[in-house]
From Swiss-Prot:
Pfam families linked: Pkinase
Lineage of producing organism: Eukaryota, Metazoa, Ecdysozoa, Nematoda, Chromadorea
Catalysed conversion reaction: L-seryl-[protein] + ATP = O-phospho-L-seryl-[protein] + ADP + H(+); L-threonyl-[protein] + ATP = O-phospho-L-threonyl-[protein] + ADP + H(+); [DNA-directed RNA polymerase] + ATP = phospho-[DNA-directed RNA polymerase] + ADP + H(+)
Organism from which the protein derives: Caenorhabditis elegans
Keywords: Activator, ATP-binding, Kinase, Nucleotide-binding, Nucleus, Serine/threonine-protein kinase, Transcription, Transcription regulation, Transferase
Name of the molecule in the record: Cyclin-dependent kinase 8
GO cellular component, one term: nucleus
Length: 588
């Protein structure tokens, strides 16, 4: 029997239905992000009433018409789940044109941009790393939010820095709080009717994908989220992705990725039968061994070299953060620590005051990270021209990356042989202080806003989509290739504070390319990326990134949360009183 809805009732409902355009200003707003299934805009209410408080919101438009099953799942989870470290769904709108809008909390920052800010920041003496106490508070709040999800039988399945938001200057009770966003891939995993891998074979951005997923496990648990948290933790400590590997076009129906598995075992060692008894039962285990034989890589003899990797960051293998990281990155998912167990680790108990899920991770100090509207945009034609020039440069050196992998000396072209400007050694430990204090070490005659190249999360544009879908969504802008070796990352060469960076000279040095797509026909600042946190600034570099010899670059960082300085203006640094406050309070 078919149920019919009375036409008069439908007309009355349409007349009473509130239109998003009548309630919020957002039409002229820049696109600030892209979720798993839609675009996100910054919105403010038009009317001052009690229905919507006068503050900023994130307005997410679900792509397509009507309610897809994925959108329904995301909305259902948002409406049921409430936690201080989860983004809050305020309202759902359904337009007469069958468009679905979600009204969410607005977060000014995300971990992707925070990490990128520290990776690309320059200093003549030491790299400006994320303060250790800030890392500790961020990690605790991520664990708290994920423990709540797991306690309610929900897997996030897409944890990465871009999906971890930080509230900016706003209500004092919300400032600096971590918010986990984008539940588009989340699923309830209690008593599934089918194995999770049959329903969704490809989940989690591959830099943060657990080894059991990469090897084709038919069943997976909350341990995949814990692995992703461990990857984010390592990236906060070093400002580099721990399991970076080159980007390739990955088939949407196959989670296996040989280079990613090899990178994991290169650092963690090839698991023995005692380390992971079930690894030989994984569907793609034999495929891994076959690929290794064909490549001539003795993957089964890889030792654990994680401690050597962190030695250059002065993180001792006996320290509490290292030990917690090892627990989070245990290859056997049955032995991997849970979020609740990680929250009770000695790493957090050593703090003078136990961390809380509502703490301000900025510790009430000025926020040094640029706001979304302060990030400049680049003209599409200029970005395309820069991208084409860099492609030509890359084609002139096709073998340099392979030479480096084989340990052969590289033939550097003369115009690219200049050392990176002010490159600091990555082994220098960053103080636990706020980034503002370390700005005083930079003796800038003037600070100007510069276009710098950073690293691009390879899956900012979505989850393991095919090449045709990616090309269509990115406006036919070709995706850059990554160097075949892991970080450290290079620095822009010959940067002059009066003129900005010169034309990029490409080098096949370690590190990803820093591709920043600019989609023709879209609002400036609109870049594909998951969730309201997926915003990327197209002005932060050309579409193919710089790779120069050396280590994380030093350079511009906006001060005190203010807009980037204009040409000819000097950016104020912290005063002596601020430095003393940080030394006495935040460095303890």
């Amino acid at each position: 029997m078919t149920l019919m809805i009375d036409e008069n009732f439908k007309k009355q409902l349409a007349q009473r239905r509130e239109r998003v355009e009548d309630l919020f200003y957002f039409e002229n707003s820049k696109e600030i992000g892209r979720g798993t299934y839609g675009l996100v805009y910054k919105a403010v209410p038009k009317k001052q009433n009690g229905q919507f408080p006068n503050k900023e919101y994130a307005l997410k438009m679900i792509e397509g018409q009507g309610f897809s099953m994925s959108a329904c799942r995301e909305i259902a989870l948002f409406r049921e789940l409430r936690h201080p470290n989860l983004i809050c769904l305020q309202r759902v709108f359904l337009t007469n044109e069958k468009k679905v809008w979600l009204l969410l909390d607005y977060a000014e920052h995300d971990l992707w941009h925070v990490i990128k800010h520290h990776r690309t920041a320059k200093s003549k003496k030491v790299p400006i790393m994320v303060p250790r106490n800030m890392v500790k508070n961020i990690l605790f709040q991520i664990l708290s939010g994920m423990h709540y999800l797991h306690s309610n039988w929900v897997l996030h399945r897409d944890l990465k820095p871009a999906n971890i938001l930080l509230m900016g200057d706003g209500p004092p009770d919300m400032r600096g709080r971590v918010k986990i966003a984008d539940l588009g891939f989340s699923r309830i995993y209690a008593n599934p009717l089918k194995p999770m891998a049959e329903l969704d074979p490809v989940v989690v951005t591959f830099w943060y994908r657990a080894p059991e997923l990469l090897l084709g496990a038919k069943h997976y648990t909350k341990a995949i989220d814990v692995w992703a948290i461990g990857c984010i933790f390592a990236e906060l400590l070093t400002a580099e992705p721990l399991f970076f590997c080159k980007e390739e076009d990955i088939k949407a129906q196959n989670p296996y990725h040989y280079d990613q598995v090899k990178r994991i075992f290169h650092l963690l060692g090839y698991p023995s039968d005692a380390d992971w008894p079930d690894m030989k039962k994984m569907p793609d285990h034999q495929r891994l061994l076959s690929d290794a034989r064909n490549e001539g890589t003795p993957i089964q003899t890889f030792p654990n070299s994680l401690h050597r990797y962190f030695d250059k960051w002065k993180i001792n293998s006996q320290s509490s953060p290292y030990r917690l990281l090892v627990k989070l990155l245990t290859v056997d998912p049955t032995k991997r620590v849970s979020c609740e167990e990680a929250m009770n680790d000695i790493y957090f108990r050593k703090m003078e005051r136990p961390p809380r899920e509502t703490d301000d991770v900025f510790n009430k100090y000025p926020i040094p990270y640029a706001k979304k509207e302060q990030q400049m945009t680049v003209a599409p034609d200029q970005a395309q021209q820069q991208h084409q020039q860099q492609q030509v440069q890359m084609q002139q050196q096709p073998q340099m990356g392979q030479q480096q992998m084989m340990g052969q000396p590289q033939m550097v072209q003369p115009q690219m042989g200049q050392p990176p400007m002010g490159g600091a050694h990555p082994g220098v430990v960053a103080p636990d202080g706020h980034p503002h204090q370390m700005m005083q070490q930079q003796q800038h005659p003037q600070q100007h806003h510069m276009q710098y190249q950073g690293m691009h999360d390879p899956m900012q544009g979505g989850m393991d989509e095919g090449p045709q879908a990616k090309m269509m969504r990115m406006g036919n802008v070709p995706v850059g290739r990554y160097a075949p070796m892991p970080p450290p990352y290079g620095a822009p060469q010959d940067y002059h504070p009066q003129q900005g960076p010169p034309m990029v000279q490409m080098m096949q040095q370690p590190g990803p390319s820093g591709y920043y797509p600019q989609r023709p026909g879209q609002p400036t600042g609109a870049v594909p990326g998951p969730g309201p946190q997926g915003y990327m600034n197209p002005q932060m570099g050309m579409q193919m990134g710089m790779r120069a010899p050396g280590v994380p670059p030093q350079g511009y960082m906006p001060g005190r949360g203010m807009a980037p300085p204009q040409m000819g203006q000097q950016q104020p640094g912290p005063n002596q009183q601020q430095q003393q406050q940080w030394q006495q309070q935040y460095h303890r």
